[in-house]
């Protein structure tokens, strides 16, 4: 177990080192504490939800692994989320999907409303957190031939338009009840496996459907929409209706947030380069932090170069105020609560490291064409003791330092998670 006095000693040394280059570690920690991550609930139950948990997962989405202790009920899922949030420094939000409605009635996706998320709102109030929303456009029989809002069938479009409208009611309810803006993120799986003849008509239908979904005005203090594109998905390799360029233009023209998912691009593209190209024209960003390995594999986020490039871009270009950072990955090969903790803490570490830099001084050097200093300082920063500042941040926020949280996870899975499977077998 990490000793508090050792953490404090290491931090004082780190504080002095950073002060030598004009960086205030206390201010950096204060800035980090203001950043709320949107923690995705679906990591906890492998995207089964509660409306129809036995429905096959579709939309090109897949979860691998069968680690014991999966959450099967609302109480189990919120219990696991509570455990994860207690191990992540700061105050955050939880992102939900339509299929996580809690109701004692048999309801279809297009019938789910605010009343079916009262359970979540009551829980969020107890936790002191906000909620984000995602309408579910997959894992349902009304996904016809891989199409929803862009379907050539009006009945299919109308069904999903209603799902979208209901999700906006729910997100507005979250904002009203919790006093925090709820970001409502729209992603659809529409596209073709093989080469289409007509690429224009599906996109025109999607524009029409989205415009109808967004026709009613809600106070942005309560909720705002984000639209998410993708390069391709399993089963729609040749053509994605909601491409990146499509949603980029839609977001700009309609005053919506543009969602950038780190796994939805070609593996050689640097998503961090997209932010500054969009922000001068757009309202803001919704970021889904993920870890693609050769494709959109949604591995648990780790403190790697890709994540560091993302956070450096946001911090250096002062874009955190207009960026909502969410997690989006799912892994059932490891303890599901630990996946949340690892991914969230990695994201926070990357943000902190980005903040612990003499940014103004480096920008000045760049303006003066002093590229030698720019390269030298940024290289030296890589070996600066930011880990000691991170440990102090955890200590200040009453969360475990280092890997001490693993002991809590081991205890939790033995007492809470593993017995769930034994109960299911017995029943």
UniProtKB/Swiss-Prot annotation:
| Pathway membership, UniProt | Carbohydrate degradation; L-rhamnose degradation; glycerone phosphate from L-rhamnose: step 1/3
Enzyme class at the top of the EC tree: isomerase
Q: In which residues is Mn(2+) bound? A: 264, 296, 298
InterPro entries reported for this sequence: L-rhamnose_isomerase, Rhamnose_isomerase, Xyl_isomerase-like_sf
| UniProt keyword terms in alphabetical order | Cytoplasm, Isomerase, Manganese, Metal-binding, Rhamnose metabolism
Please give the NCBIfam families that the UniProt record associates with this protein.
PRK01076.1, rhaA
Q: What is this protein called?
A: L-rhamnose isomerase
**What is the native source organism of this protein?**
Lactiplantibacillus plantarum (strain ATCC BAA-793 / NCIMB 8826 / WCFS1) (Lactobacillus plantarum)
Whichever gene encodes this chain, its name is rhaA
């Amino acid at each position: 177990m990490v000793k508090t006095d050792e953490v404090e000693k290491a931090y004082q040394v780190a504080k002095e080192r950073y002060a030598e280059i004009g960086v205030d570690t206390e201010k950096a920690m204060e800035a980090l504490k203001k950043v709320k991550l949107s923690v995705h609930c679906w990591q906890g139950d492998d995207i089964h939800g509660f409306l129809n948990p036995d429905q096959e997962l579709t939309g090109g989405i897949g979860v691998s692994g069968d680690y014991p202790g999966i959450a099967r009920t609302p109480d189990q899922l919120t219990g696991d989320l509570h455990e994860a949030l207690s191990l992540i420094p700061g105050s955050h939000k939880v992102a939900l999907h339509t299929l996580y409605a809690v109701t004692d009635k048999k309801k279809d996706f297009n019938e789910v409303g605010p009343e079916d998320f009262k359970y979540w709102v009551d829980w969020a109030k107890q936790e002191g957190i906000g909620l984000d929303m995602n309408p579910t456009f997959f894992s349902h029989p009304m996904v016809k031939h891989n199409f929803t809002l862009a379907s050539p069938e009006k009945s299919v479009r109308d069904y999903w338009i209603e799902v979208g409208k209901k999700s906006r009611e729910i997100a507005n309810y979250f904002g009203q009840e919790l006093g925090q803006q709820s970001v409502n993120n729209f992603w659809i799986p529409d596209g073709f496996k093989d080469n289409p003849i007509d690429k224009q008509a599906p996109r025109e239908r999607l524009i029409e459907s989205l415009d109808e979904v967004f026709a009613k005005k809600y106070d942005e203090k309560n909720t705002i929409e984000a639209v998410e594109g993708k390069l391709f998905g399993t089963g729609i390799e040749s053509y994605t209706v909601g491409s990146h360029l499509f949603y980029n233009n839609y977001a700009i023209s309609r005053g919506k947030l543009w969602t950038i998912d780190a796994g939805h691009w070609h593996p050689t593209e640097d998503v961090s380069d997209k932010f500054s190209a969009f922000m001068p024209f757009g309202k803001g960003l919704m970021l889904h932090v993920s870890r693609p390995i050769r494709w959109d594999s949604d591995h648990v986020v780790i403190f790697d170069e890709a994540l560091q490039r993302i956070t450096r871009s946001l911090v250096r270009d002062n874009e955190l105020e207009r960026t909502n950072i969410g997690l989006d990955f799912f892994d059932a090969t490891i303890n599901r609560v630990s996946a949340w903790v690892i991914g969230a803490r990695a994201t926070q570490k990357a943000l902190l490291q980005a903040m612990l830099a003499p940014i103004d001084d480096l920008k000045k050097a760049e303006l003066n064409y002093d590229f030698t200093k720019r390269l030298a300082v940024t290289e030296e920063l890589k070996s600066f003791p930011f880990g000691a500042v991170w440990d102090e941040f955890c200590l200040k926020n009453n969360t475990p330092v280092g890997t001490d949280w693993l002991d809590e996870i081991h205890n939790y899975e033995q007492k809470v998670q593993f017995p769930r499977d034994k109960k299911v077998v017995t029943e």
